[in-house]
Amino acid sequence: MKIPTRKIASAAAMTTLTSVSLAAAIEYRDALDIAVAPREEALERTDSLVLSAGDRIAYNDNVYLLPGYITDLTTLPGIGPNPSRKDYIDSISGGMDAEWLTGGRQSFDLGLHADYNRYFRNQDLNNVSSNDRVAWNWGLGNALSGQVGVDYQRILGGFSNTLVYSRAIVTRTDYFGSMRYQIGPRWGIFGGVLGTEYNVSAAQGTFNNSKSRGVDLGADFTTDTNRIGFDYRFNDSRAPNSIVLNGIVFEPDYREDRARVLLKYALTEKTLIDASAGYLKRQYPNGTIGNFSGEIWRAALQWQPTPKTQLLLGVWRQLDADLTSQTDYFVDKGVSLTPLWIASEKITFSAVIGRDTNNYVGSNPIGPIPVAPITEARHDTLTSETANMLYTPIRAITITVSAGHSTRNSNVSQFHYNDVQGSLSIVYKFFRYGNTP
């Protein structure tokens, strides 16, 4: 019996987390990680097209992620007129997902998703977000295959690591290309290139703008349920501007080497482990500021005791950074537990309980904004609890209800917060063509 490993991803998709790092049980894979992995061949593939529309109403009782002692929001740097700690957000969305088969092993994928996000009170935060992808999946003979494509993301920058509270739109663009050479049915050699561009619209955040170029090489041995392999990634990141941190000129450019062993192994018919472990070294021009070298690892254990229940346990140690603050990065160690229950063909419940600690690497304990100095690097502890219900009354309609709470404690008082969120969303697939879910 083959374990349905795709359910790990579906459980993650149902979960809304305040902290992205709390989703690390399901390892973050960038566009190139996805492109070089063995591709699961879909059965009965056809040309397909899905058009959808939706609406999401969300409530957030701490939009700016402020500590409790701040009561007068009008004194905060950069904040808009008539600010409110609590707010409702209405997000109207539209999307298109398509696949065109142009040959036996050739296809084009297109995904376009846009949201208009309207804040009821903090109207200066209104924004348009999007998450788009176009990719060409190619194959040559029986042994060569790969992907070429572009991913684009546009979001409102969060307020978890900032002391300026104006609207900042963050965009990330990934350009990627990969190739896999299959040596027989089990062994494979892969490689690829990745270019990434970060841009932050707010003037106070432009020091985080960067362009990076990466190369990935590796090999693996795969079966129907198992995979063992290794990969090496080199990344060269360049930022246009230097910044002054704690009185020292800091160059955000860096070079990074990462080597990992990759493992996916079915322990039993009901238990699967997906893990990686390796070593990462990051070097900055300022030899005494910001350099990091050490082990990184992650393990996710999926247990499916019945066809309708699943438990996912994750632990990790990674080098991470907030999307809006690429120069302010940290060592993230955490654990999460994700139960999932398919109550019926139409209703699924899931939850996430997570805890992680973030130890900021000595580039700066709090970033370039001067506040009360501290004698040690910043250290945060985050906890989060989230519950979700997904209801599909008919195949074309999906309704999701979500509620969550998160807390961050820090040795820098400005970064304490408690946050409660809730949301109700509905998505209607009003047009479907081909073999679509």
How should these model regions be labeled?
Residues 2-12:
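Bacterial N-terminal signal peptides that target proteins for export
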